[in-house]
Design a protein with these regions (language model features):
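N-terminal glycine-rich phosphate/pyrophosphate-binding loop and immediately adjacent elements
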Residues: 3-132
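Rossmann-like flavin
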Residues: 92-199
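Generic structural signal for well-ordered, non-membrane alpha-helical segments
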Residues: 58, 101, 119, 123, ...
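A short, glycine/Asx- and small/polar-enriched loop/turn
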Residues: 95, 195-199, 250-257, 367-369
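Helical element adjacent to the flavin cofactor pocket in flavoenzyme catalytic cores
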Residues: 205-260
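Generic, well-ordered alpha-helical scaffold segments in large soluble proteins
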Residues: 15-16, 21, 25, 171-175, ...
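Mid-domain catalytic core of redox enzymes
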Residues: 247-366
Length: 369
């Protein structure tokens, strides 16, 4: 019996994960990637012995990756080595205060008590609240698509009881009094483009997720995980075609029929998925269809969350005081975020996120760097 054919456009984390699932489910799957390496936005550069990852820097749920490899009876550890990051993050402020966010309760309690003894009990209540959110919003509903706030409430009335309509920062304030601690427990939304003063408190579940699963880094860099997924996909019989950009998703009578490549060749598929940018997908890949044009117009009118301005640099000496993840908060936390999200203005006293992977994996740079 002929296997159904599936195409995946884009070889980022989502595209490769889907391709592995399709191939494991019995599809004859092809991944089309326009660049010379897999990874999409999780691209990588190597220069003068340094490894520069363009992709995400934090892995918080290795169990999801384990499940993906287990679909075909494989083990994640046979393909990539995940290293535990400790502390998870070092947070610092302009007044000289630092806070190491670790997975050691006694060390956390000591740091919190040094700031405000009353917040030790408050933090424990916050952790219990985060655990409730984790069970409801991640374990029960992590696979459920929420297309709007109403659909979330219909699917999960318990989230209303947990006050998911309030912001992360507002809920954190219910538990701790110290401003530094409030920032330490609410900054996570910034890593996904959301303001802690406006993003639903359901995102406070990230704290429980990290305390449960840890924070990890792949030996060799984030792209080592991309390489692992691409290797697994090809071992399962999938086809990865690099430097092969897709031009359009072909359709007939309202149904997808295949992929037209940049060179003009059309290949037929039973199903096609796009892991490319969503606006690009509707405007370019499906721009010849009424649905594509209408969705592109709608999306262009939406308000998008901000991205990051990233500078990659290599240092000539080691800096042992640096931690893997260091976040330096500016002097105006609420005001600065308000300017970015409310006025689209980047002030001079912005906050910094410093990613120093050599603190965990010395192989990311030449010896002595």
């Amino acid at each position: 019996m002929t296997k159904p054919r599936a195409a995946v456009i884009g070889s980022g984390f989502g595209g490769l994960a889907l391709a592995v699932r399709l191939q494991s489910a019995g599809f004859d799957t092809t991944v089309f990637e326009g660049r010379d390496k897999p990874g999409g936005r999780a691209y990588v550069w190597h220069e003068e012995g340094f490894t520069f990852d363009a992709g995400p820097t934090v892995i918080t749920d290795p169990d999801c990756l384990e499940q993906l490899f287990a679909l075909s009876g494989r083990k994640l550890s046979d393909y990539v080595d995940l290293i535990s990051v400790d502390p998870f993050y070092r947070l610092c402020w302009e007044d000289g205060h630092t806070f190491d966010y670790v997975n050691d309760q006694a060390k956390l309690d000591a740091q919190i008590a040094a700031k405000n003894p009353a917040d030790v009990a408050g933090y424990k209540r916050f952790l219990a609240y985060s655990e409730e959110l984790f069970q409801e919003g991640y374990v029960k509903l992590g696979h459920v698509p929420f297309l709007d706030f109403k659909s979330m409430i219909v699917a999960a009335p318990q989230l209303m009881k947990l006050q998911a309509w309030r912001s992360v920062y507002a809920k954190v304030c219910d538990f701790v009094q110290d401003e530094h601690l409030r920032q330490a427990l609410s900054f996570h939304t910034l890593l996904v483009g959301g303001s802690p003063f406006a993003t639903s408190s359901i995102y406070a579940l990230i704290h429980a997720l990290e305390r449960r699963g840890g924070v990890w880094f792949p030996r060799g860099g984030t792209h080592a995980l991309i390489t692992a997924l691409a290797t697994l996909f090809q071992e399962l019989g999938g086809t990865l075609r690099l430097s092969t950009p897709a031009k359009t998703i072909t359709t007939q009578a309202g149904r997808v029929t295949g992929v037209e490549l940049a060179g003009g060749k059309i290949e037929a598929f039973d199903t096609v998925a796009s892991n490319a940018d969503i606006v690009h997908t509707y405007e370019k890949l499906l721009g010849h269809t009424k649905r594509g044009r209408s969705e592109a117009k709608r999306l262009k009118g939406a308000r998008f969350s901000p991205s990051l301005f990233v500078v990659h640099f290599g240092l000539k000496a080691e800096h042992p005081q640096m931690r893997h993840h260091t976040i330096c908060f500016g002097s105006r936390y609420r005001e600065l975020i308000g300017e970015i999200y409310g006025k689209n203005n980047l002030a001079n006293d912005f906050s910094l996120y410093l990613h120093a992977p050599c603190a965990t994996d010395k192989g990311q740079a030449p010896e002595g760097c």
